[in-house]
Amino acid sequence: MPSGSLWRVLGLCLLSVGAWGQEDNEDPLEPSPQTSASARYKVSISGTTVVLTCPEDLGSESIKWERNGDLLPNEYGEQLFLDDFSEMENSGYYACYTSNSLEKNYLYLKARVCQNCVEVDTMTAVAIVVADVCITLGFLLLVYYWSKNKKASSVTMMRGPGAGGRPRGQNKEKPPPVPNPDYEPIRKGQQDLYSGLNQRGI
């Protein structure tokens, strides 16, 4: 079997196992979510407060709210305000209905809220990431060129005249060292013991 077909078969197997596992995870005690095109809930989050707005097709009759099949007391308006929303305690299936409603439309709500969160749209998030990457790359290039120049200057200072070629850099300005006095050349006009060859008669 070619490798491409093997990957397709493996993908189909994983997909079927995932769908089968998802069906098994449904709790039969929880209400099944039913949504129609006309029943659309509106959800707005501000800080730690979540506001649910009932669909418009229910009219202005007395609206009741329930969560996970239990009626919420003292909640009869078109909007349901959930202050200090907790993901663990307040998540679940919500429904709003009137006494004349034939069926209930459920909304599964699971949200994470925080006190000082700021909502950022997609373009702003992408711009922040791109700017961060560009600044980081620019900083890395500056460090690279600075370390490269520092290494080149240190190699130039350490190289001596015998390392091949003329001395460069600061060695160019220094005068050559004074010769050793033991090997100092004889000056003209100076007569020392060994300044010339004397012939002796035999």
UniProtKB/Swiss-Prot annotation:
Q: Which superkingdom?
A: Eukaryota
Sorted alphabetically, which SUPFAM superfamilies does this protein's record hold?
Answer: Immunoglobulin
Region Disordered, as annotated, extends over 156-202
Disulfide connectivity for this sequence is C54-C96
Gene Ontology CC terms, in alphabetical order: alpha-beta T cell receptor complex; external side of plasma membrane
List, for all copies, the residue spans of the domain called ITAM.
173-200
Q: Report the residue ranges that make up the Ig-like domain in this protein.
A: 33-107
InterPro entries the record matches: CD3_esu/gsu/dsu, Ig-like_dom, Ig-like_dom_sf, Ig-like_fold, Ig_sub2, Phos_immunorcpt_sig_ITAM
Q: Which GO terms describe its molecular function?
A: transmembrane signaling receptor activity
Q: Where is the chain membrane-spanning?
A: 126-146
Q: How is it modified after translation?
A: Phosphorylated on Tyr residues after T-cell receptor triggering by LCK in association with CD4/CD8.
Q: For the modification Phosphotyrosine, which residues carry it?
A: Y183, Y194
> Annotated region Proline-rich sequence: where?
174-181
Give residue ranges on the Cytoplasmic side: 147-202
Regarding the membrane, this protein is recorded as:
Single-pass type I membrane protein
| Region NUMB-binding region, residue ranges | 170-187
- Cellular compartment(s): Cell membrane
Where in the sequence does UniProt note compositional bias of the Polar residues kind? Answer: 192-202
Q: For this UniProt entry, which residues form the secretion signal?
A: 1-21
Quote the Pfam families the UniProt record gives.
Ig_5, ITAM
- Any one GO biological process: cell surface receptor signaling pathway
Q: Which residues lie on this side of the membrane: Extracellular?
A: 22-125
Q: Which UniProt keywords apply?
A: Adaptive immunity, Cell membrane, Disulfide bond, Immunity, Immunoglobulin domain, Membrane, Phosphoprotein, Receptor, Signal, Transmembrane, Transmembrane helix
Record's function text: Part of the TCR-CD3 complex present on T-lymphocyte cell surface that plays an essential role in adaptive immune response. When antigen presenting cells (APCs) activate T-cell receptor (TCR), TCR-mediated signals are transmitted across the cell membrane by the CD3 chains CD3D, CD3E, CD3G and CD3Z. All CD3 chains contain immunoreceptor tyrosine-based activation motifs (ITAMs) in their cytoplasmic domain. Upon TCR engagement, these motifs become phosphorylated by Src family protein tyrosine kinases LCK and FYN, resulting in the activation of downstream signaling pathways.
Q: Subunit arrangement?
A: The TCR-CD3 complex is composed of a CD3D/CD3E and a CD3G/CD3E heterodimers that preferentially associate with TCRalpha and TCRbeta, respectively, to form TCRalpha/CD3E/CD3G and TCRbeta/CD3G/CD3E trimers. In turn, the hexamer interacts with CD3Z homodimer to form the TCR-CD3 complex. Alternatively, TCRalpha and TCRbeta can be replaced by TCRgamma and TCRdelta. Interacts with CD6. Interacts (via Proline-rich sequence) with NCK1; the interaction is ligand dependent but independent of tyrosine kinase activation.
Q: What is this protein called?
A: T-cell surface glycoprotein CD3 epsilon chain
